[in-house]
Amino acid sequence: MTIQEIRQYLTQFFDPVELVGEGDAVIAGPAKIESAARGEVSFIANEKYLRYLSLTSASLVIVHRSVDVSLYAGERSFLKVSDPYTAFVFVLQKFARPRTLAKPGVAPTAAIGGGVSLGEGVAVGEHAVIGDRCSIGAGTVIAPNAVIMHDVKIGEGCTIFPQVTIYDGTLIGDRVVIHAGSVIGADGFGFAPQPDGSYVKIPQMGVVEIGDDAEIGANATIDRATMGSTVIAKGVKVDNLVQVAHNCRIGEHTVIAAQAGISGSTIMGRGCMIGGQAGFAGHLELADRTHVAAQAGVSKSFLEPGTALRGYPAQPMREQLRHEAMLRHLGSMKEKIDRIDRELKEQGASRD
């Protein structure tokens, strides 16, 4: 693509897209600003990287429209937009090579159950298994060795990577991506304790529902509901190695980083951000746009939208930082208390 073609492409998403410099040069691909070479495109979205305006060898740099690039316009070209980070994401999408996980049609070694509906252009890879009465939407790719049990419905344009297991009754929307090794719809962790110390398994009779445009990372596990549905709403992004327990409801466009553990019946609002290794006690609720720091332990509900939480047990950010500051001074406070105690004892002894 030429620089001018990239500019024209970005006008679908931004207005204006200002070109500073030549537009005829051919761009072969994207690169990091630190290592970009001639013929490559990069971006700067953070002020601390502005020094690379003079250091980079990139032929094209995408910057914020407020950045003054006049000193460098003779060395390379610039595209000025309102959000250079997102603009570069769109450029990456343009240059990204699609993965070929399976060819359209059903591979010879795939096993397809009875009453299965396959939409136009569906691809089912080698040794994949699709159970009875499943419905797979147009353009969806089922990679080799994926297992889809009975009565599963998958929408259009989805990608199911190798070794994914989708249990019976799961409902998946359009354009959903589920990465390798993930398990969707396994039994929730439900056991009734008995007087003798043993446990009776509670049948897990619900399902998992995953909304449009969600993405599930590798080796994530999302358990089916005891009754009703475990819900991963539209646009949710779940990182690798995340556990979502039975009957959780994750609100639209929430993002959950790796190794977070979400106990049963947790309800998260829209647009929440959950840091890596955060833990949730279960049967609690988070309001919209709640931010939970990495390794926080959330043990109760927080119903004020936009709250930032950190620490164990998790508390609002300012409160937790204040407590941490107090803890840092415990040593000196103890010394002061010990000194005062000695002085009081000495004063008492002198009176005697």
Swiss-Prot record:
Q: Might you report a single GO cellular component term?
A: membrane
Superkingdom field: Bacteria
The protein's enzyme class: transferase
Instruction: Give the Enzyme Commission number.
Output: 2.3.1.191
Active-site residue list: H246 (proton acceptor)
Q: Name one GO biological process term.
A: lipid A biosynthetic process
Tell me the route in metabolism or biology where this protein functions: Bacterial outer membrane biogenesis; LPS lipid A biosynthesis
Q: Is this entry keyworded Protein biosynthesis? A: no
State the Gene3D superfamilies in the record.
Hexapeptide repeat proteins, MurE/MurF, N-terminal domain
Q: List the catalytic activities from the record.
A: a UDP-3-O-[(3R)-3-hydroxyacyl]-alpha-D-glucosamine + a (3R)-hydroxyacyl-[ACP] = a UDP-2-N,3-O-bis[(3R)-3-hydroxyacyl]-alpha-D-glucosamine + holo-[ACP] + H(+)
- Is Lipid biosynthesis tagged as a keyword? yes
Q: Which GO terms describe its molecular function?
A: N-acyltransferase activity
InterPro entries, alphabetized: Hexapep (IPR001451), Hexapep_transf_CS (IPR018357), LpxD (IPR007691), Trimer_LpxA-like_sf (IPR011004), UDP_GlcNAc_AcTrfase_non-rep (IPR020573)
What are the UniProt keywords, alphabetically? Answer: Acyltransferase, Lipid A biosynthesis, Lipid biosynthesis, Lipid metabolism, Repeat, Transferase
Subunit comment for this entry?
Answer: Homotrimer.
* Described purpose of this protein according to its UniProt entry: Catalyzes the N-acylation of UDP-3-O-acylglucosamine using 3-hydroxyacyl-ACP as the acyl donor. Is involved in the biosynthesis of lipid A, a phosphorylated glycolipid that anchors the lipopolysaccharide to the outer membrane of the cell.
Q: Of which family is this protein a member? A: Belongs to the transferase hexapeptide repeat family. LpxD subfamily.
Return the HAMAP family for the record: LpxD
The name this protein carries in UniProt is: UDP-3-O-acylglucosamine N-acyltransferase
What does the organism's lineage look like at the top?
A: Bacteria, Pseudomonadati, Chlorobiota, Chlorobiia, Chlorobiales
